[in-house]
Amino acid sequence: MAKISVMGTGSWGTALAILLHNNGHQVMLWSAHPEKAASLNQTREDPKKLPGIIIPDGIVITGDEKTALDSPDIVVFASPSAYMRAISKRLSPLVRQGQIIVNVAKGVEENTLMPVCDIIKEEIPQADVCVLSGPSHAEEVSRGLPTTCVVSARKKETAEYLQSLFMSPVFRVYTTPDMLGVELGGALKNVIALAAGTADGLGYGDNTKAALITRGIAEMARLGAKMGAKLETFAGLSGIGDLIVTCASVHSRNRRAGYLMGQGYTMQQAMDEVQMVVEGVYSAKAAKALAEKYDVEMPIIMEVNKLLFENKPASEAVKDLMQREKQEEISWEL
């Protein structure tokens, strides 16, 4: 049995706390807002984020970070990527040397172009930062539906240790050395999912969605390869796996936000309607900047940025994608 603190009471942090508790671990769930911790302690449910899911009494819920970071074996960072630097800075003085931190947030910081793990490493240099990612909606994990993810760490032994902690009969975990590829897949797929949702909102069909998914993963892999990630990572759980579920699922807030924009909502109206953090909106500008920095052609990413930040009509964005110059899918040159 391990002592595990999950930092963040959003849907994903709560779902992972329940999973780890059911695996027999001693779990503490921390909220950055003491009033929310008090409310969850009283009701044991978050009807807004995970309706109908009861947090087991064995999970200790606290709003005190000193208590949460009192010698845990591992710490899970589950705050949204947009808040990760502030949270990391706040918690850094309490994190011991060599502490294993598992990041489960997905995103790239706009002003630094850093993936989330790099943000945590910069603010908490004494920690051993790892990442868990893959096609894993909290709504399904919290209900015990079969799910598969991937974990990456600096050392193989650490990845295998985390694999053993998270693995269960309904939650299968693979390991990989490619932390950068795992993080890029998790961040970029949210932007592509906005495009897929927009196509749904416009009333387009499965052909359109299949095109966005396959051409989207091509964009993600091109950028990843230029940045030093492994191409095969994008054919795995944190790449195409996460992209498929985020583009297709009714649980996907990125897909839903895109759907609403396809229906005529503005970006802000769509975010207000979703009522939860839409990570793709925060990662879109960073994805565009990375494409420009590494000179990688990413037309879907570019059109999503125009849709979000230049008020380009969704139908015009799709038309411009369809009317691009003729291309090879695979090079004819050996």
What are these regions (language model features)?
Residues 196-197, 225-235, 243-334:
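NAD(P)-dependent Rossmann-like dehydrogenase/reductase catalytic/cofactor-binding core
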